[in-house]
């Protein structure tokens, strides 16, 4: 398994943010990680990437246990955080070259130019990051996650701030990457899940309430009626009343 989670638990004071969850994701699989705000999505992703230590349980990236060997695990991961920390005074190429050096990429210039082309950054590559629109800043974050050609992509809200045209381009990029990589991404845009994902994991109040191929989701959970949409299933599983 490219991503394997075994009994991960994280508490903040008296609040249990992630409650002993387990799941796995294989190579070539794109999995949507869904849940309302505060459900535990970002906390889980931070534990998977070694930025937060679990209180219990273990996470493995391509067989490497994250807590015991975080540096090796991170080299196998491309991570786009929800709060995408960038350096506003650096030029796009300069920043991506810096990330490539940190990731010990051997062909830095070639890798940077390839990823600029792949993520559609070429028209803005001559600018400093601080002068970019929110959508292009998001592309820079995605390019930084991809520049070292990782086996696993963990993307927290990767389409946030994109206009409809950019959204389609990034959607297609994620789908293309998912053919050879392992992709776990969170989003609040359920249409993105339907367009991109092979499978969906829904988390609510720190607990996994659904884990199923998208096409079989309605058959694997208890629902009040047949023919419910993904949005209706999501609302039902996360305790939201149906709209009138």
Where are these regions (language model features)?
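Conserved ABC transporter NBD signature motif
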Residues: 57-68, 72-73
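Conserved ABC ATPase "signature" region
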Residues: 97, 101-124
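A short, proline-enriched helix->beta-strand linker immediately N-terminal to the Walker B motif
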Residues: 147-151
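Catalytic Walker B motif of ABC-type/P-loop ATPase nucleotide-binding domains
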Residues: 153-157
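A short, surface-exposed alpha-helical micro-motif characterized by mixed small hydrophobic
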Residues: 193-195
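ABC ATPase "signature
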Residues: 211-212
